[in-house]
Curated annotation (Swiss-Prot):
Protein name: Oligoribonuclease
Active site: Y139
Domain Exonuclease: residue ranges: 17-182
Superkingdom of the source species: Bacteria
Entry annotated with the keyword Nuclease: yes
Keywords carried by this UniProt record: Cytoplasm, Exonuclease, Hydrolase, Nuclease
Gene name linked to the record: orn
GO cellular component: cytoplasm
InterPro entries listed in its UniProt record: Exonuclease_RNaseT/DNA_pol3, Oligoribonuclease, RNaseH-like_sf, RNaseH_sf
Enzyme class: hydrolase
Lineage start: Bacteria, Bacillati, Actinomycetota, Actinomycetes, Bifidobacteriales
Purpose: 3'-to-5' exoribonuclease specific for small oligoribonucleotides.
Cross-referenced CDD domains: Orn (cd06135)
Length: 216
């Protein structure tokens, strides 16, 4: 399959990551679980924060609240979120505000990448509940949990000494912790910038091709 998006070229100033974290009433989107909090922080690809970010609490339906299991209910009670969503925004209001915020940091004609931790779960809910927002983002994403799983298996010391987390299951704090975690992995086990030069990169690529099982 040909990926037409590989033809997209961005200058450094156009490169953006849109970090998003969501809190939900559960993970069963088809069983009626809903978004109750969405936070966004924009960064460049060097992981420099471009703005302090936004956080919006969304009022869930009574059905979604009643659908919560005890674990989720206790989690949102401890974080204080359960006491805030009664005065939260409607889903439509939240999507509009988040979309407007994202577009402030998106150069015209560019769709930034979504970033986060175990971002697949968040993306599933965003695709379902905030399709207009997602239409402005690239279909690719940066998932910090990928680096975590690689570190766990390839660099155990890096994994064991990763920065501690204490976000308390609030979306904005979770984003900052995920961002810091990726900054840590970048310093701990990735080649220092600017990485291998052109000749070294070609040599590495040639070695990979030569040893690929496709050539056996």
């Amino acid at each position: 399959m040909v990926d037409s998006h590989d033809a997209e070229t961005y200058s450094a100033k156009d490169s953006r990551l849109i970090w998003i974290d969501c809190e939900m009433t559960g993970l069963d989107i088809f069983g009626g679980d809903e978004l109750v909090e969405v936070s966004v922080v924009p960064t460049d690809f060097d992981l420099n924060v471009l703005d302090e970010g936004v956080d919006y609490v969304i009022k869930p339906s009574e059905k979604a609240v009643n659908h919560m299991n005890d674990f989720v209910r206790q989690m949102h009670t401890r974080s204080g979120l359960i006491n805030e969503w009664e005065n939260g925004l409607s889903l439509a209001e939240a999507e509009q505000k988040v979309t407007e915020y994202v577009l402030r940091f998106t150069p015209e004609g560019v769709r930034p990448l979504l970033a986060g931790n175990t971002i697949g779960s968040d993306k599933k809910f965003l695709d379902h509940y905030m399709p207009n927002l997602m239409s402005h983002l690239h279909y690719r994403s940066v998932d910090v949990s990928t680096f975590k799983e690689l570190a766990r298996r390839w660099y155990p010391a890096v994994y064991e000494n990763r920065p501690p987390k204490n976000g308390g299951h609030r979306a904005l704090a979770d984003i900052i912790e995920s961002l810091d975690e990726l900054r840590y992995y970048r310093k701990a086990f990735m080649a220092p910038a600017p990485g291998p030069d052109d000749a070294a990169s070609k040599a590495i690529a040639a070695d990979i091709v030569a040893t690929s099982i496709l050539n056996k």
